Amino acid sequence: MIATIIPDVRNHYPVLLSEIISIITPQYGGTFIDCTFGQGGYTKRILNFPETKVIALDRDSESSIKAQELQNSFEDRLLFKNIKFSQLNNLKLKHENIKAVIFDLGYSLNQIKDPKKGLSFDSIGELNMKMGINEFSAKEAINQLDEKELTKIFKYFGDEADSKRIAHNIVEDRSKREITTEELVRIIESSKRKRNYKTHSATKIFQALRIFVNKEISELIYGLINAAKVVKKDGVIAVVTFHSLEDKIVKYFFKSLSENKSISRHMPKTEEKLNLFKSVIKKPIVPSDKEIRENPPSRSAKLRYVIKKEDFFDFETDILDKFKHLIDIENLSKKL
């Protein structure tokens, strides 16, 4: 869930950049939090406006190299922290007027192609998938979790129709040999009942493992909760998602705190649900045809945003209960 997928490492292309800038209005100055710094695409564009400051976060320590380059140009207007964005509430922001918090939940192409990270089914590197500040790798998950646990991960995080068959064959094969990236791809391809010629057979399984290894569900949920706490009144929370599970979580969080659902006209106002956000759009913003032509991986991007109506820092949300079944699957990692 870190940085946008881009077609060329040399020409970084942050997805929906123009749309993000028009929403957060850095031309009027202010302090912004870029929760997924990556290659610094959003941050650099924001800092090009003179009265701005950016607090940039990224769990991938390699992002600090690009951050240092920008710090050389923008000096004290950029603060970089190598932390997970779920921890943004630990930042000392008492004297900061946070105008917007931005999340881009994709992966950059250089991360996908890095054999050390082992994120791709095309990689010949170790089955790793750790994006930084991790407790375990995909190799440990694949070689240690049982068939039922692997099936849950593949089904709920990858929406894989053949989850049970693939998990069964993984457990069968690992009793004979350690599962590597190449071996995992072979098992997946041989387990699939139907071939989808539009996408690689291993796409959904590798997505599921990336989500599991990096605990992307709880990371996103706590990131959203803490973003809502730190952003000031009239500030923006903007999130770019790349698959339906992420979008479902973001949509639910924004909607549940943007309206009073099923409120009885007989209920006292003091019992009404907190209306923390103003929801500006009903449907997500998607890339233009031009952007998709220039950057094909952006086709799956969706941008949702809300504006904070009040300066409340304590509020109730049921999002942890709503997605508890997914967090419970992440917690299977306690066995590793």
Swiss-Prot record:
Its EC number is 2.1.1.199. GO terms for cellular component: cytoplasm. It is an enzyme of class 2 (transferase). GO terms for molecular function: rRNA (cytosine-N4-)-methyltransferase activity. Pfam families: Methyltransf_5. Specifically methylates the N4 position of cytidine in position 1402 (C1402) of 16S rRNA. InterPro entries: RsmH, SAM-dep_MeTrfase_MraW_recog, SAM-dependent_MTases_sf. GO terms for biological process: rRNA base methylation. It comes from Pelagibacter ubique (strain HTCC1062). This is Ribosomal RNA small subunit methyltransferase H. It is found in: Cytoplasm. Keywords: Cytoplasm, Methyltransferase, rRNA processing, S-adenosyl-L-methionine, Transferase. Belongs to the methyltransferase superfamily. RsmH family. The gene is rsmH. The keyword Cytoplasm applies. It catalyses: cytidine(1402) in 16S rRNA + S-adenosyl-L-methionine = N(4)-methylcytidine(1402) in 16S rRNA + S-adenosyl-L-homocysteine + H(+).
